[in-house]
Structure formats: structure tokens, C-alpha cells
């Protein structure tokens, strides 16, 4: 399913001045390109459900660095590319700690730390944190649609 309008990529060029992210990525809170239902799905995290298919296929894991669009990944510095040493994941430590929306270098460092420290114990801790995080997202999305 689609959470953004078909013209989202073209519209991004017009929205570059509103980019809230540092580094080579494009992020806008309350992105105007979302469809009505897409906004709800994105705010609750339900837009990630189709990614479970990629996990079942073996292309992704539940936990790990979030994949970047190809054009953005091509702009990474060499040290930042270490995040690609493992398969991408649906749930990133950077999302759970908030560095995903802060500083790009902090986000990359969080991803690389996960690559270096990856273990079953780390994934269990992330799973517990993710459940708490998703519960909070759902509550906020229902309270503020």
C-alpha cells in the first residue's frame, strides 16, 4: 500500500528548503506528501508491516540500520557505509533512541554501534524498547489523528 502521493518524489524537490535533517537525508515531520490514511499509518508505524515480507524473504532483519533510499545512501561518507556491513532492519536503535530525528552523524554512529555490538541480548533489549515505543506511538496517533 502507498502512504504518500504518487507525485511524492517530484514534490520532494519543491520541499528541500523544509528539510529538517542534517546530512544527505530528507526528513520532514508531518510531511505534506502523505495521504490521509498514510499519515496515520506512518505515525503509528503500521506502514512498516509490509516490510515483514522482506524479513521473511531474508532481505531484511527485524533489527538493524534502516535502509536509505539509493540516492541518499550514495552520499554517505566512507565511515558511515559500515552500517551496510549487515542486512538492513525494520527497527533501528537510532529510531528507538531518537537520534534518527536529531543529528545525522549521531544516527550513523548509533547504526554502526549496533553493527559492532549485534547480539541476541541486544536484540531482546531492542524488542522490549520497541514494544514500549510502538505502544506510545499508537496512543499518540489515536489521541492526535
What are these model-derived regions, one by one?
Residues 1-145:
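Conserved small/aromatic sequence motifs within transmembrane helices
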Amino acid at each position: 500500500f502507498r502512504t504518500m502521493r504518487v507525485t511524492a518524489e517530484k514534490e520532494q524537490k519543491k520541499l528541500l528548503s523544509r528539510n529538517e535533517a542534517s546530512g544527505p537525508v530528507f526528513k520532514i515531520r508531518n510531511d505534506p506528501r502523505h495521504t490521509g490514511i498514510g499519515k496515520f499509518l506512518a505515525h503509528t508505524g503500521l506502514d512498516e508491516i509490509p516490510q515483514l515480507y522482506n524479513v521473511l524473504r531474508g532481505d531484511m532483519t527485524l533489527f538493524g540500520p534502516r535502509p536509505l533510499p539509493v540516492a541518499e545512501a550514495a552520499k554517505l561518507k566512507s565511515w558511515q557505509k559500515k552500517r551496510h556491513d549487515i542486512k538492513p532492519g525494520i527497527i533501528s536503535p537510532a529510531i528507538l533512541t531518537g537520534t534518527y530525528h536529531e543529528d545525522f552523524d549521531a544516527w550513523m554512529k548509533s547504526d554502526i554501534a549496533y553493527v559492532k555490538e549485534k547480539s541476541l541480548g541486544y536484540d531482546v533489549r531492542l524488542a522490549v524498547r520497541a514494544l514500549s515505543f510502538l505502544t506510545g506511538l499508537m496512543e499518540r496517533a489515536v489521541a492526535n489523528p
